[in-house]
Amino acid sequence: VHEHRAEINEWLLKTSKLVRAQARSPKRPKKISRGSVLIGAKLKGLDLRGANLRRALLIAADLRNADLRMSDFIGADVREADLSGADLTGSIFLTQAQVNTANGDANTKLPPSLQIPAHWVTNR
């Protein structure tokens, strides 16, 4: 099982690198990377395209209007993070379970495989 898991992880890492390379932002802050502790961080409106957010702690982070296109969210903790108006188009390894723990609104752009949770403000 360990060998199989290691092989799968290698493929996930390669996929992440290929996807994120297409969208890397030269303006992305250096403090944002794999495993970053960004609990309560003020990241509103930042260009985070192609960010490696694997295992990042984004609990209660302010990501309103942030550009998170093609970012890697595998294992990221986004509980109570504010994704209102954020663009997560093309993000990889972002799950419905993660989205369900975050906050957002009708202006949040999600990958097509995910749905806006019922608790988000949708201005219907």
Segments and roles (model prediction):
Residues V1-P26:
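Terminal amphipathic alpha-helical/low-complexity segments used for targeting or macromolecular assembly
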